[in-house]
Amino acid sequence: MPKHGKRYREVSKLVSRQELYEPDEAIELLKKTASAKFDETVEVAVKLGVDPRHADQQVRGTVVLPNGTGKTRRVLVFAKGDKAKEAEEAGADFVGAEDLVEKIQGGWLDFDVAIATPDMMGLVGRLGRILGPRGLMPNPKAGTVTMDIARAVKEVKAGKIEFRVDKTAIIHAPIGKASFEASKLKENFQALMDALLRAKPATAKGQYLKSVSLATTMGPGIRVNPLRAVK
């Protein structure tokens, strides 16, 4: 296990490993633990009471964070004709079809989100082995395969994120930067928690939110009382 640096050990003293904090307290404490020389990302980790091995207990979805992520996301759109024009007008960074497929097959991956119109998926499907493992493949469930291209682009630019439970039943999601005001982080946190509740599988039994923690990129985890994580 790697040893943590002096700075990490110092800020860790501020955090009780036993205590379950109120969301407001956790966010205030989190801002005190962020002392790196760059603007650290704030991430939430939620352990869910689901068994991801079962198809009917998969948890995935999207949420538009009201205050954005603090990161400028580069959006690529696979579209032609009027839909390509719509994408450009909505603020997409890259728009194209066969030309973009060839570029990506050549190793170019300088974008954060890919969106496609349904008619383009036959073409985009060739990129499955490249985009799939990186979580970049357009997907109807994530709202990234759609005819409403303008809305999809604008939502991503505004702070839409995708969440998906991993094989250990944990969801990791960014909710902003350490430089955000505490109130804005709280609003983003609440939006994510509400979205997780909406995505609860009907077959999930027992306690759904088993544990919740917050951390900055370089900071210690701060445990949040899961019973208080949702209003």
Swiss-Prot record:
UniProt keyword annotations, A-Z: Repressor, Ribonucleoprotein, Ribosomal protein, RNA-binding, rRNA-binding, Translation regulation, tRNA-binding
Single GO term (MF): structural constituent of ribosome
Source taxon at top rank: Bacteria
InterPro entries per UniProt: Ribosom_uL1_bac-type, Ribosomal_uL1, Ribosomal_uL1-like, Ribosomal_uL1/biogenesis, Ribosomal_uL1_3-a/b-sand, Ribosomal_uL1_CS
Record-level GO cellular component terms: large ribosomal subunit
Coiled coil regions, renumbered to chain: none
Record GO biological process: regulation of translation; translation
SUPFAM superfamilies linked to this entry: Ribosomal protein L1 (SSF56808)
Subunit record text: Part of the 50S ribosomal subunit.
Function statement: Binds directly to 23S rRNA. The L1 stalk is quite mobile in the ribosome, and is involved in E site tRNA release. Protein L1 is also a translational repressor protein, it controls the translation of the L11 operon by binding to its mRNA.
Family: Belongs to the universal ribosomal protein uL1 family.
Protein name per the record: Large ribosomal subunit protein uL1
Source species taxonomy: Bacteria, Bacillati, Bacillota, Clostridia, Moorellales
Gene assigned in the entry: rplA
